[in-house]
Swiss-Prot record:
Subunit structure: Part of the 50S ribosomal subunit; part of the 5S rRNA/L5/L18/L25 subcomplex. Contacts the 5S rRNA and the P site tRNA. Forms a bridge to the 30S subunit in the 70S ribosome.
GO CC annotations, alphabetized: ribonucleoprotein complex; ribosome
Organism: Wigglesworthia glossinidia brevipalpis
Protein name according to UniProt: Large ribosomal subunit protein uL5
Protein keywords: Ribonucleoprotein, Ribosomal protein, RNA-binding, rRNA-binding, tRNA-binding
GO molecular function terms attached to this record: rRNA binding; structural constituent of ribosome; tRNA binding
Amino acid sequence: MQLYDFYKKNVLIKLKNKFNYKSIMQVPKIEKITLNMGVGKASFDKKLLEHAVNDLTLISGQKPYITKAKKSIANFKIRQGHPIGCKVTLRGKLMWFFFQKLICIAIPRIRDFRGLPVKSFDGFGNYSLGIKEQIIFPEIDYDKIDKIRGLDITITTNAKSDKEGLALLSAFNFPFRK
């Protein structure tokens, strides 16, 4: 909860003054963090999906739910209703704990890291990033994984624009590319 206290004491005041808000309730905040791990061959091999669920459970501290295909796609050999990945939505204390772990531990462990692109905002202040290796998280034991998998992380804010979302994440020293 250290990062939440930092948000309450420093970030709120800094953003309120920067954007000239009348109330601190107008200041953008992080609402949720969504982790998604797609497992393309999950319909053929159930073990792959089990390993992905296990990895995501270790990373997030919460049990993920299995996502299923909405439509059948012949080229990808996917049928409607077949499992294709797993997903976790973090809110509250777990969200702040994961966000701190992401900024302080996981992102610095990325190989050849030169900063995150600013272009990954969606137009409404939400930020998405993709991680190529799950082994950057300290909970994943390198010797026990079956395959290196990537995951998608979406940080959802209640910011009204990308400029506000960028200011919010930059206030937490999020490592954006200069």
